[in-house]
A protein has these predicted regions:
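Active-site core segments that coordinate phosphate-bearing ligands/cofactors
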Residues: 1-168
Length: 168
């Protein structure tokens, strides 16, 4: 329903974002023929719009990653300081402000967005997320920035796969 409501057209892509993502594209039958697009979650005739082949891809974790990091950062507030319960709600906003101020360097921490496995490209529920390049000087905003970049590059990997396969 989200793709139809967003006005999906052949060559376009709709990304429904929440705890995970669902990336939806459509193509004309004559453009796809009997070919199966590799590494995506689903390809079904008429599944999105009648008369078109529907394609579904997505990230197994998106908003879940940010919610996890907020809980991680908020744990001391909730369990030790027993402060205002609304303080935890402020964490992501403050991290965003600080992360935007950080310069881009070759020493930045990096992350993989596979915290719930990988849905697309090439589904594998066994792979795991990762944050690397940490030192004792790494700040919470730097880790948050790495997580944001991981979800952005995870999205890019989906876009690139669909382009490689001639769908979007």
């Amino acid at each position: 329903v989200g793709a139809v409501g967003a006005g999906i057209v052949p060559g376009g892509l709709v990304k429904v974002m929440g705890t995970s993502t669902c990336d939806i594209a459509i193509a004309r039958y004559e453009e796809i023929g009997d070919r199966t697009v590799r590494g995506i979650c689903g390809q079904v005739d008429g599944s999105v719009v009648p008369g078109y082949v529907g394609f579904e891809a997505g990230q197994a974790a998106f908003g879940d990653i940010y919610a996890w990091f907020r809980r991680l950062m908020g744990w001391p507030l909730k369990h030790i300081a027993k402060g205002d319960p609304h303080l935890e709600e402020l964490i992501l906003g403050e991290l965003t402000i600080e992360a935007e101020r950080l310069p881009l360097t070759v020493d930045d921490p990096v992350a993989l967005d596979w915290f719930n496995g990988r849905r697309t490209p090439d589904a594998d529920p066994r792979v795991q997320g990762c944050i690397s390049g940490l030192t004792l000087a790494t700040s919470a905003p730097a880790i948050f920035k790495a997580l944001v970049e991981a979800t952005a590059f995870g999205s890019r990997a989906i876009n690139e796969r669909l382009l490689e396969e001639g769908v979007a």
